[in-house]
Amino acid sequence: MAPANLGLTPHWVMLLGAVLLLLLSGASAQEPPRVGCSEYTNRSCEECLRNVSCLWCNENKACMDYPVRKILPPASLCKLSSARWGVCWVNFEALIITMSVLGGSVLLGITVCCCYCCRRKKSRKPDKSDERAMREQEERRVRQEERRAEMKSRHDEIRKKYGLFKEQNPYEKF
C-alpha cells in the first residue's frame, strides 16, 4: 500500500482561501449602516438608548454620542441629573451614588473578611511566649514523673528490705 498524500495541494489552498474571502465579505456586507445618535433627538429615550453608544439628555430631549474619552459627560453637554445612559429610569447622579455605595460595601466586606481570617489564623497559632510556657510545663511534668518513679522504686526497695512488699492476692495465705 502506498502512503496517502494528506498535505494540502496548492489547488485546495486557493479554493479554501477563496471560500474564506467570500464568507468574510458576505458577513461584512450584512451589517446595517450605522445610524448616528443625533437622529433620535426629539424622539423617545427608549429609542435613543437602544444604541449603547448613545446618551439621552432629558432636559432638552437630545440624543447624542456618548463622550467615550471622558468617564462622565461634561456639564456643558448635559447635566448629570438629566443624563441617561443604558436605561431611561436611572440618571447619572443616582447611578454614580449607587455604584459608589455598592463599591464601598464590597470593599468594606472584603476588608472585614480579610481581617477576620487573619485574626482567626493568628489566634489558632500559639505565639512564642505560649510555646515557651507549654514547653516549660511539659518539662516540669516530665521531671515530676521521673521523681515519682524514683520515689516509687525507693519505697519498693525499702518494703522489700523489711518484708513489707504488697502481695498480688492478699487471700492467698489462707
UniProtKB/Swiss-Prot annotation:
Biological-process GO terms, alphabetical: negative regulation of DNA damage response, signal transduction by p53 class mediator; negative regulation of intrinsic apoptotic signaling pathway by p53 class mediator; positive regulation of protein catabolic process; positive regulation of protein ubiquitination
Residue numbers on the Cytoplasmic membrane side: 115-174
Domain PSI: 36-89
InterPro entries linked: PSI, PTTG1IP
Compositional bias (Basic and acidic residues): 126-155
Glycan attachment residues as annotated in the record: N42, N51
Keyword hit for Cytoplasm: yes
Cellular component, GO annotation: cytoplasm; nucleus; plasma membrane
Residue ranges crossing the lipid bilayer per the database entry: 94-114
Region described as Disordered: spans on this chain: 125-155
Main localisation: membrane
Keywords assigned: Cell membrane, Coiled coil, Cytoplasm, Glycoprotein, Membrane, Nucleus, Phosphoprotein, Signal, Transmembrane, Transmembrane helix
Coiled coil: 127-163
SMART domains in UniProt: PSI (SM00423)
Residue(s) carrying Phosphotyrosine: Y171
Signal peptide: 1-29
Compartment(s) of residence: Cell membrane; Cytoplasm; Nucleus
Topological type in the membrane: Single-pass type I membrane protein
Segments in the Extracellular topological domain: 30-93
Self-association and partners: Interacts with PTTG1.
PANTHER family linked to this entry: PITUITARY TUMOR-TRANSFORMING GENE 1 PROTEIN-INTERACTING PROTEIN, PROTEIN CBG20567
Biological role stated in the UniProt entry: May facilitate PTTG1 nuclear translocation.
Protein name: Pituitary tumor-transforming gene 1 protein-interacting protein
Gene: Pttg1ip
